[in-house]
Design a protein with these regions (language model features):
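Active-site microenvironments in enzyme catalytic cores
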Residues: 2-126
Length: 126
């Protein structure tokens, strides 16, 4: 996993805006690596951090973290060797047994991801 950033701050902001727009208006976008094939995992996490910052500025509440690509088969399919970590906000979570409008989704489907809702903030190095 590369810890080197290859994207400029401007690229990170622009890609974040693209992801945010797609999420807000529920439309599909091409993979970010289609435009930036040299994009590193660190770049991806930088885009995610900018998205998290924007959501929190819009009064989303950070409630936990989720892990994706947790199976070996999915990691191989996606060309990575470690799971990915993402954030979970109150606006992403749904109460148990609640209805979800499919019009709010791009490609409606169920996908198992491990998520952690924490009672207190996690603290530590990195």
């Amino acid at each position: 996993m590369s810890t080197q950033l290859t994207l400029s701050r401007e690229d990170i902001v622009r890609l974040c805006e693209r992801v945010e727009g797609a999420e807000t208006r529920a439309y599909a976008i091409p993979k970010l690596t289609d435009e930036y094939p040299a994009m590193t995992v660190a770049d991806g996490y930088a885009v995610q951090a900018e998205l998290r910052r924007r959501f929190i500025a819009q009064a989303h509440k950070l409630i936990g973290w989720k892990a994706g690509l947790t199976s070996k088969a999915k990691m191989v399919q996606m060309g990575v060797n470690v799971p990915s970590i993402g954030f979970l906000t109150d606006r992403m979570a749904r109460p148990e047994n609640s209805a979800i409008k499919t019009s709010d989704l791009v490609h409606p489907r169920a996908e198992c991801e491990v998520a952690f809702v924490t009672k207190a903030d996690l603290k530590g190095p990195n």
